[in-house]
Amino acid sequence: MPPYTIVYFPVRGRCEATRMLLADQGQSWKEEVVTIDVWLQGSLKSTCLYGQLPKFEDGDLTLYQSNAILRHLGRSLGLYGKDQKEAALVDMVNDGVEDLRCKYGTLIYTNYENGKDDYVKALPGHLKPFETLLSQNQGGKAFIVGNQISFADYNLLDLLLVHQVLAPGCLDNFPLLSAYVARLSARPKIKAFLSSPDHLNRPINGNGKQ
């Protein structure tokens, strides 16, 4: 029996970074897929702490909130920096990823048709901090923090990949980010995950927009 269970919709959404992390770390997990019809019936939603998914089970521990799940796995699998200073930087990066992910979610679910052009125009300003962070860490040739991968790397990689779908070429003026995406995507287990039918057949978002 896999030690982890992901309860989520049949989309990448806020769970693909967690799935990518688990795959890269050689962990197995069980998926409990919740269709929108089942969700709208309300019985499952009423049992969820915040009335939302994902839900994540690690043995007898049940977690909600995608970033809490990532931080838990970061602590338990050694993906949280080598010391307190690096852990603080990992948290900072992940909060920056969350800020941009929220902007992306608002665009996708509330203002896609009218807001996409303005969003894409503003995107370089939102990507620049991550390029800066890479430049400050071993010349951008390593990870986003330190010399070992962290949960924030998986979250950032997933966010950059979905933005490359939204706005192809969005990383063209960010050579360090472009190389970072290529480098992490080439890690054998991440490469296998990204080319797997499970990943490829999952829509990025629940409304079909990307």
From Swiss-Prot:
- Residue stretches making up the GST N-terminal domain: 2-81
Where is glutathione annotated to bind?
8, 14, 39, 45, 52-53, 65-66
- The UniProt record lists the EC number as 2.5.1.18
What keywords does the record list, in alphabetical order?
Acetylation, Cytoplasm, Lipid metabolism, Mitochondrion, Nucleus, Phosphoprotein, Transferase
Q: Which residues carry this modification: N6-succinyllysine?
A: 103, 116
GO cellular-component term (any): mitochondrion
**What is the main EC category here?**
transferase
Give the GO terms filed under biological process for this record: animal organ regeneration; cellular response to cell-matrix adhesion; cellular response to epidermal growth factor stimulus; cellular response to glucocorticoid stimulus; cellular response to insulin stimulus; cellular response to lipopolysaccharide; common myeloid progenitor cell proliferation; glutathione derivative biosynthetic process
What Pfam families does the entry give?
GST_C_3, GST_N
UniProt cross-references to Gene3D superfamilies, sorted A to Z? 1.20.1050.10, Glutaredoxin
Query: Domain named GST C-terminal: which ranges?
Result: 83-204
Organism domain of life: Eukaryota
Q: Which residues carry this modification: Phosphotyrosine?
A: 4
Q: List-wise, which residues carry Phosphothreonine?
A: 62
Q: Where in the cell is it found?
A: Cytoplasm; Mitochondrion; Nucleus
Give tissue specificity per the record: Present in kidney, lung, testis and placenta, very low levels in liver.
What catalytic activity does the UniProt entry give for this protein? RX + glutathione = an S-substituted glutathione + a halide anion + H(+); prostaglandin J2 + glutathione = prostaglandin J2-S-(R)-glutathione; prostaglandin J2 + glutathione = prostaglandin J2-S-(S)-glutathione; prostaglandin A2 + glutathione = prostaglandin A2-S-(S)-glutathione
Q: Which InterPro entries match?
A: Glutathione-S-Trfase_C-like, Glutathione-S-Trfase_C_sf, Glutathione_S-Trfase_N, GST_C, GST_pi, GST_superfamily, Thioredoxin-like_sf
Residues with N6-acetyllysine modification? 128
State the PANTHER family in the record: GLUTATHIONE S-TRANSFERASE (PTHR11571), GLUTATHIONE S-TRANSFERASE P (PTHR11571:SF255)
Q: Which family does it belong to?
A: Belongs to the GST superfamily. Pi family.
Q: What is this protein's function per UniProt?
A: Conjugation of reduced glutathione to a wide number of exogenous and endogenous hydrophobic electrophiles. Involved in the formation of glutathione conjugates of both prostaglandin A2 (PGA2) and prostaglandin J2 (PGJ2). Participates in the formation of novel hepoxilin regioisomers. Negatively regulates CDK5 activity via p25/p35 translocation to prevent neurodegeneration.
Name listed for the protein in its UniProt record: Glutathione S-transferase P
